[in-house]
Amino acid sequence: MTYSVFIAGLVAGATLNLLLLRTILAPPFRIWPAPEPGSWQSLTFWSLFRGGMMLTLVVAALDWDSVHLLDRSRFIGVPLFLVGFGIAICGYFNLGLGNTYCGSDGLVRHGLYRFSRNPQYTASIVGLFGLALAANSGLTISLAAMMAVAYVLMAYAEEGWLSQLYGKPYRDYCRQTARFLDVAGILALLDRKKPSRQAG
């Protein structure tokens, strides 16, 4: 059963990634952002994406600790999984439901979007990395890597669409904000929040 679920996840992830690559390399074909709810693109994308993510979780449970690649240090994966997907959920609240599902509810630059143009994707990749570490399973590592690639391709696939939709404000935002993570900006913010030391 484990291998059947793994093969299904592999097919879903590989198909999704090939369609995303075609979106990037061969416009006007577009699987993501999906043109409209109910379209074949939307149904195909969400079936493959949700299926790939769900099957990755199922394989992690079925194949848990099967290869003993790592020692107890792998349990750092659990907090990475929780924090990663917790931040991704926060990103949905910043972005709004409409924008999350390919709407045009306005360009979002506040909250997590000050530090990343794709905070949900970035955090989800961290969560997948945590899942792969914690599961200690070669099959889970393969599927998690496949879905992490999907998140990267999704970020690239939507940039042309967003540029066309929002024009110069989006292009300015791209120049000011990292695609995945503005490490320097985060460090600067943390530094500003440190209490100043006064000579006494």
Regions found by a protein language model. Give the residues of each.
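Membrane-anchoring alpha-helices and their flanking helix-loop junctions
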Residues: 1-109, 127-200
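Histidine-centered phosphotransfer motif of kinases
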Residues: 110, 114-122
